[in-house]
């Protein structure tokens, strides 16, 4: 799908028809999983070849940030959620050429959707492709800041459950959610680092107007301010995970202690019972009228004596 936008009164206006004449007036062409026919339209009408989705998966810096005859290329990660609401990353290709911005992605993304909504009423200042690119990155960082705030709030709720130490269904669910928050934080960190590298490359390779250069530097400062907050999330997750493992270990030790006490208590009575289970011809107690009650009493005493001794020593 091709979403083309042209400038009208310093605002982005969507182009309804994807003809060559209409596309030539576009300043931003946003492509979501384009078909081979749509790729051919761009190739024939604008002379622009697009990256493949396999190329978007390359993580080497030389393959993600470069400049060639097809323009300036940036491949950047954007935070999103998959169909099961788990944290995910989508790689987006940005290409700036002949005053146009081309974006290529394989799915709809919250940052793009939010920027399109804002662009209906928001005027561009410099009215060029780099401003649209920087605005998208700015929206991306705002989204990441919101994600960090959400994780902070979720960890606050999880800490109450985990630090309470009461194990059960809520405790197990908290552990599962904790691992999800760790995964979310790691993806946010990757997005921040990736955006930092992309903007640094953009500032080095282009001569941006003063306003846009300041905007790029402001985004970089925002990234630097968010990174410590995100790192503190990792520390909080690690603390809660260690606390949870500690409570689990204590509970396991308590259960093992119970089994140990039971085995110690019942071992002496078992010894008494095994003595009277021996098959000897001469066992005086067998002929004694009160032999059986005496054996039961001896077994009870053998069970109580070690329990009393261990209790007095403070071992239980």
UniProtKB/Swiss-Prot annotation:
GO cellular component, one term: plasma membrane
Listed transmembrane segments: 258-278, 290-310
Record-linked SUPFAM superfamilies: CorA soluble domain-like (SSF143865), Magnesium transport protein CorA, transmembrane region (SSF144083)
Keyword Lipoprotein on entry: no
Catalytic reactions of this protein: Mg(2+)(in) = Mg(2+)(out)
GO MF term set: cobalt ion transmembrane transporter activity; magnesium ion transmembrane transporter activity; nickel cation transmembrane transporter activity
InterPro entries, alphabetized: CorA_cytoplasmic_dom (IPR045861), CorA_MIT (IPR050829), CorA_TM1_TM2 (IPR045863), Mg/Co-transport_prot_CorA (IPR004488), MgTranspt_CorA/ZnTranspt_ZntB (IPR002523)
Topological relation to the membrane, as annotated: Multi-pass membrane protein
Motif Probable selectivity filter, chain ranges: 277-279
Subcellular location: Cell inner membrane
Matches recorded under Pfam families: CorA
Essential for ion permeation (site feature) positions: 253
UniProt keywords, alphabetically: Cell inner membrane, Cell membrane, Ion transport, Magnesium, Membrane, Transmembrane, Transmembrane helix, Transport
Protein task: Mediates influx of magnesium ions. Alternates between open and closed states. Activated by low cytoplasmic Mg(2+) levels. Inactive when cytoplasmic Mg(2+) levels are high.
Subunit organization: Homopentamer. In the absence of Mg(2+), interactions between subunits are weakened, and dimers, trimers and tetramers can be observed in vitro.
Family classification: Belongs to the CorA metal ion transporter (MIT) (TC 1.A.35) family.
Domain free text: The central ion permeation pathway is formed by the first transmembrane domain from each of the five subunits. Mg(2+) binding strengthens interactions between subunits and leads to the formation of a symmetrical homopentamer surrounding a closed ion permeation pathway. Low Mg(2+) concentrations trigger both a conformation change within each subunit and a loosening of the interactions between subunits. This results in an open ion conduction pathway. In addition, this results in a less symmetrical shape of the whole complex.
Full protein name: Magnesium transport protein CorA
Provenance organism: Pasteurella multocida (strain Pm70)
